[in-house]
């Protein structure tokens, strides 16, 4: 016969009710940590709990409220609006003798005006705000709200953490699966934990599904590889297409390419694609890497990156992903230079600081008689008619910027040759200047 407990999800039944049952986050909840001491003493302060799904944000908020003997009002930023916040505040004011905690799940979902609605009530102490978010608060929450709260970063649970949670659920007869006599060999437990990818809720949900499908043999419910294979059909990676993990992984890919590590580059590329990242986005980023971090040290990298982009457009997933992988490996192994990147930034800063300086007359086009009469294009020297294809002594910058340099090629790859050629041209300019000075 089914009990009422059987209709409650295992993850809910096994939710810790006190700090002693809470698994993980020892950097916050160690006995010598400020947050642990504050919770134990029942001291409340507004906070943002930032961490990945299944890391314990909601559970921790409930434990904090229970320890403080506070009323709890819970809303989801995805569904609630300013009116819901006002209703919570009104109820809190009617219960002034008892602290009110407003727990806001997915708090990053509130826009600026909704976030501002909290501020006066947090400042007056009418409510204590505990917001939970999977997104970086510095990007998603306004400064006024952040300045009135403390941000606590919850880490992804380790495999050891999840094993502890799983084994507790298997052993617990009151809230868990202890009465079912479920037998899961150690290697299969680790497969479940690895599949859950740091998410305690996901781990327990998987365990519950496995328990439901397990077949009884002589009074025991045995789990084998076949059952695990059926349940664990598709990985759920720690990834959000526009969340913190997304940008972390893109950053890791870019830095691995820049650091000339093809193996790490392939790993992070695979993580992104496995997590559902748009391959076109990755292809665009690889083009950026080819320009920013390789540049003229190996111009073939840019062409290969563009070819990979086009190849993916033609082939799609999954065949076209190999072309992106090829470009990533080439870029990781190519000679590196950020000289063009730095030069372009320097030139852009110059333009912003100096404004619209005039183009020298001899560099201007003169398609009409009037322009020619105004000396447009006068004394311009056509470089192809000069020795070495270089018009020594000609200045191409505005007069006030003559002599300014932005591009400094380095001693790697093709830029070695570029550097030699530019040094040769500078010597020709110096010789021309010396010759002109001697004439005067």
UniProtKB/Swiss-Prot annotation:
Pfam families: AAA, AAA_assoc_2, MgsA_C
Superkingdom of source: Bacteria
Residues spanning the signal sequence: none
A Gene Ontology biological process term: DNA-templated DNA replication
UniProt keyword annotations, A-Z: ATP-binding, DNA replication, Nucleotide-binding
Family: Belongs to the AAA ATPase family. RarA/MGS1/WRNIP1 subfamily.
Protein name: Replication-associated recombination protein A
Organism encoding this protein: Coxiella burnetii (strain RSA 493 / Nine Mile phase I)
